[in-house]
Regions:
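N-terminal beta-loop-helix "entrance" segment that forms/cooperates
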Residues: 35-51
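Glycosyltransferases and closely related glycan-assembly transferases
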Residues: 52-58, 68-80
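Short acidic active-site motifs
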Residues: 47, 69, 92-93, 282-283, ...
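Nucleotide-sugar donor-binding catalytic core of glycosyltransferases
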Residues: 2-12, 121-122, 127-302, 325-328
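Structural motif
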Residues: 6-10, 62-66, 85-86, 106-109, ...
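Active-site proximal beta-strand in glycosyltransferases
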Residues: 73-88, 103-106, 125-128, 155
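Short N-terminal targeting/anchoring amphipathic segment
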Residues: 3-6, 50-65
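Catalytic binding pocket for nucleotide-activated donors in carbohydrate/polymer assembly enzymes
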Residues: 4-7, 11-14, 18-23, 28-37, ...
Length: 394
């Protein structure tokens, strides 16, 4: 097929393109949003239509969902394939999600169950994938100096979410509501496998939050996104992620030497060793491969799905210790291909065990790498995607 891919510089776009080409497809890239992060609707239309004409495109493809691309595909009678790799993706609640030209693939089974009711024939559950060959090449070419530099007992690469937490911009909430929300967030922080926040938000509470938030994200009149869902997933979900990551690393850094690579401010966690940012495609794989334990606390808006980072870690043959996510159990064996925790106390206990049993870490990391190399590569996942998409109607 001739595939037009609309890019915005997602970390997995290059891997998807390599996978598509390996399957024999011709790929044409629209890079408008790589260069301009806020293009107008007309600019998107012009760039995509020009790309369609140049490539004689059979389908339009993107990482995450773009309502504008769905509308273009509908008008030009093409299929639009989108692979959801993040959460929350509020665009999924656009009225365009009902378009029959859509083929939407969602990595989180809970989110899939929520969204698929709007277009049941054309929305699918599909886990993410691993780019094993690419990452292994980076590891093989690592210098001795880099191996020494990036070898750690316990490491984490990623944001603490403290610098990108929209919840913190709310002003003048009443003490009662502020305290209630804090209690909900502290409770949800400790619970894995079930996201209950939205159930505990009254309409009155949501209205007060919206009233006190300058620039609250509001969906269009015909869209499917409610103010309550926006508050639960976008504002509160990201805030809980920030709280959990700060609390987790503050707790662990008092007991272990923990190395982190992040642009987030870690001054509140003085014993945490923050090395700043690293290069995603060259240095990060070495950290993953050479760390005894790679921690991966999942962003709370990912309710059940396996984050892309876990596939990246396993592709690098890194040992993964992550929180419980229900979808994990469908694809991996805890204690054999990675390991999971359900509380901060269990996390501490498992860290102590694995630091004194590094041979077990290496064996589990090897098993996890073998699993993703065999069953979770991009070419395999993209083949699954197209098989599912081809058997559904427009």
């Amino acid at each position: 097929m001739n595939i037009l891919i609309y890019r915005y510089n997602s970390i997995c776009e290059d891997a998807v393109i390599r996978g598509l080409k390996e399957l024999g497809h011709t790929v044409y890239e629209v890079i408008l949003e790589v260069e301009n992060k806020s293009p107008s609707g007309q600019e998107i239309l012009d760039a995509v239509v020009m790309g369609m004409e140049k490539s004689n495109a059979d389908i339009i493809f993107s990482i995450n969902y773009y309502p504008a691309l769905s509308e273009i595909a509908r008008v030009y009678k093409l299929l639009y394939y989108s692979w959801i790799v993040d959460a929350p993706v509020l665009e999924l609640y656009s009225k365009t999600i009902k378009n029959r030209c859509n083929r939407v693939f969602i990595f989180d089974s809970e989110l899939y169950r929520e969204i698929s009711v709007y277009n049941p024939y054309n929305i699918f559950y599909l886990p993410l994938a691993s780019d094993c060959d690419f990452y292994q090449k980076a590891i093989r070419h690592a210098s001795l100096a880099d191996v020494e530099k990036y070898t750690h007992n316990i490491s984490f690469v990623g944001s603490l979410y403290t610098e990108k937490c929209p919840y913190d911009k709310v002003k003048n909430l009443s003490p009662k509501i502020s305290g209630y929300l804090h209690g909900i967030m502290k409770a949800q922080e400790k619970i894995y496998g079930y996201y209950f926040v939205e159930e505990l938000l009254s309409d009155e509470l949501v209205d007060e939050f919206v009233k006190n938030y300058d620039g609250y994200y509001l969906a269009g009149e015909e869209d499917l996104l409610t103010k309550k869902r926006t508050l639960a997933q976008f504002y509160i979900g990201n805030k809980i992620t920030a709280m959990e990551r700060v609390d987790t690393f503050k707790y662990l850094s008092e007991k272990f030497e923990v190395d982190i690579y992040t642009a987030s401010d870690t001054k509140e966690i003085p014993k945490l060793k923050n090395h700043g940012t690293i290069m995603t495609h060259t240095q990060m794989p070495i950290v993953f491969n050479k760390s005894t334990i790679n921690l991966n606390p999942t962003s709370k808006p990912i309710r059940s799905g396996i984050p892309l980072r876990i596939f990246d870690l396993l592709a690098c043959e890194g040992f993964v210790l992550c929180n419980y996510q229900s979808d994990l159990l469908n694809e991996f064996l805890p204690g054999e291909e990675l390991d999971i925790y359900s509380s901060i106390e269990e996390l501490e206990e498992k860290i102590r065990y694995y630091l004194s049993h590094t041979d077990v870490c290496r064996e589990i990391a090897h098993n996890g790498h073998e699993k993703v190399s065999k069953y979770h590569t991009y070419p395999l996942r993209l083949e699954q995607m197209f098989r599912l998409g081809e058997h559904r109607r427009r």
